Amino acid sequence: MKQRLLFIGPPGAGKGTQASRLCETHGLRHLSTGDLLRSEVSAGSALGQEAEAVMNRGELVSDDLVLAIVRSQLTALNGQGWLLDGFPRNVAQAEALEPLLGELQQSIETVVLLELDDEVLVERLLARGRADDNESVIRNRLEVYRQQTAPLIDYYQARGLLISVDAQGSVEAITTRLEASLA
């Protein structure tokens, strides 16, 4: 199985769930950028302090700062396989990630696109019951995904790295399809 993966897909497609399952089964390190940011802040590292100051102002953490955190994590893995989830979110970030991986003598082996119909995504996200998950907010998040993140599909497809996995059905059914596509 591939050892350096990237997950992309719309909110509610099950990226976090499937990433956790795959990493546990295959001994990969799950690098979720949201979790990495929170971990750096909790640890009080220099990068964490910088990220915390930005987040406390209600601003988005810069691409450079996220890249620095990703670099730090990848360097610490000493060759262990990884799955990157939540970054890159746009083509500019993907273009910035490539030279970083080159410096570390690593590369993305496969990009997994979890695909799902919008109506199913909306139903899933509403069923989670999060306070900020109302239908208009969810539809706005899907639109932001289409504008910013969806161009990554073409970017990675042009590089021959993209595989699509149907993310409809049960968690187990999706995992089965995912495992088969990565075999």
UniProtKB/Swiss-Prot annotation:
The alphabetized list of GO BP terms reads: AMP salvage
Catalysis: reaction(s): AMP + ATP = 2 ADP
Major subcellular site: cytoplasm
Q: What is its EC number?
A: 2.7.4.3
Q: Which Pfam families match?
A: ADK
Which locations, inside or outside the cell, does it occupy?
Answer: Cytoplasm
Source domain of life is Bacteria
State the Gene Ontology terms under molecular function.
Answer: adenylate kinase activity; ATP binding
Q: Does the keyword Kinase apply?
A: yes
Q: Tell me which GO cellular component terms the UniProt record holds.
A: cytoplasm
Q: Which UniProt keywords apply?
A: ATP-binding, Cytoplasm, Kinase, Nucleotide biosynthesis, Nucleotide-binding, Transferase
Q: Where is this region: NMP?
A: 32-61
The cross-references to SUPFAM superfamilies, in alphabetical order and at most eight, read: P-loop containing nucleoside triphosphate hydrolases
What family does the entry list?
A: Belongs to the adenylate kinase family.
| Self-association state and partner proteins as the record states | Monomer.
PANTHER family reported for this sequence: NUCLEOTIDE KINASE
The domain section of the record reads: Consists of three domains, a large central CORE domain and two small peripheral domains, NMPbind and LID, which undergo movements during catalysis. The LID domain closes over the site of phosphoryl transfer upon ATP binding. Assembling and dissambling the active center during each catalytic cycle provides an effective means to prevent ATP hydrolysis.
What protein name applies here?
A: Adenylate kinase
| Organism of origin | Synechococcus sp. (strain WH7803)
Q: Which gene encodes it?
A: adk
